[in-house]
Design a protein with these regions (language model features):
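Exported/extracytosolic protein signature
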Residues: 2-210
Length: 210
């Protein structure tokens, strides 16, 4: 999902004092256009129990000066639950890959969090950076049908106004069946009777119909 390129408007007015008189100038209006834009995309848009989600964060610099000393922070889908804050995703260690203009770079400093933090990022002038990493759903990931996880990445540092981007993944919908077969008694006497038991479990979020 794309982050928004923001534009800030500022005004300025001069005042001239001479003797007992005061003269105000017109109001000059200017615009500041952010040169960084961020997008965040999940490679797979659905998730399941104990599933891995691969995220791709892209940062583009439309300016003519490199942006250095940036930090990329991911809230890992944190959401309010009563008075608590639950985090449904856990960063998978050693999965960060950092590319500058498509070329793989040395892995930057990573703090697993939450929030996940990747620091020491530099975006070349007129260039782009891509950061790829994996997160795993944990016990706080909602699994009911139509549940979703929305997480936000924030790019900050280097004297810039923080830039954010969001991505939403949806819980996989459908039955998830397992079957276990057992036999009793064990051991059985010759010409004895065996009883087979089948246990079918559905750990999915919808019923399994015939």
């Amino acid at each position: 999902m794309k982050g928004c390129k923001k534009m800030a408007i500022f005004t300025n007015q001069a005042q001239l004092r001479y003797g007992n008189a005061v003269a105000n100038s017109n109001v000059a209006v200017g615009e500041i256009l952010e040169v960084l834009a961020a997008t965040k995309t999940a490679v797979r848009k659905i998730y399941g129990q104990n599933d891995r989600v691969t995220y791709v964060v892209s940062i583009a610099n439309s300016g003519n000066t490199a942006m250095t000393g940036l930090t990329v922070a991911d809230d890992l889908g944190a959401y309010a639950f009563g008075t608590d804050t639950l985090v449904p995703l856990t960063y998978v260690a050693d999965t960060v890959r950092y590319y500058s203009n498509g070329i793989l770079q040395t892995t930057p400093a990573v703090t697993a969090g939450p929030p996940l933090s990747v620091s020491g990022i530099s975006v070349p002038a007129g260039g782009n950076v891509t950061i790829v990493y994996e997160a795993e759903t944990n016990a706080f990931a909602p699994l009911l049908a139509e549940s979703e996880i929305t997480n936000t990445v924030t790019v900050s540092g280097g004297g810039i106004t923080p830039v954010t981007a969001k991505e939403t993944v949806i819980a996989e919908s459908g039955p998830k069946l397992t079957i276990t077969k057992s036999v009793s008694p064990v051991p059985v006497t010759e010409n004895g009777t065996l009883t087979y038991t089948f246990l079918i479990q559905n750990t999915g979020n919808t019923a399994a119909l015939a």
